[in-house]
């Protein structure tokens, strides 16, 4: 355990930041999983709705500074490509 006041503060800050990051990572994983499941089930309306939610959530994480703009664009692009595949089929 830390002895200095500043070191104790840093430990608390790190714990808080770690918890927040874990929440955001899980959120991204869950929303992308929802799109994947809808696409695998070939449910067009569910896939479109899940994609709409995923797009909004991912871009909100960009505005919070959790992920970079290019990373969000790549994730959204891949999800959109999957949704378009079942649209064409």
From Swiss-Prot:
It comes from the Bacteria. Keywords: Ribonucleoprotein, Ribosomal protein, RNA-binding, rRNA-binding. SUPFAM superfamilies: Ribosomal protein S20. The keyword rRNA-binding applies. Binds directly to 16S ribosomal RNA. Belongs to the bacterial ribosomal protein bS20 family. The keyword Disulfide bond does not apply. Pfam families: Ribosomal_S20p. InterPro entries: Ribosomal_bS20, Ribosomal_bS20_sf. One of its GO terms (cellular component) is cytosol. This is Small ribosomal subunit protein bS20. It comes from Sulfurovum sp. (strain NBC37-1). GO terms for biological process: translation. One of its GO terms (molecular function) is small ribosomal subunit rRNA binding.
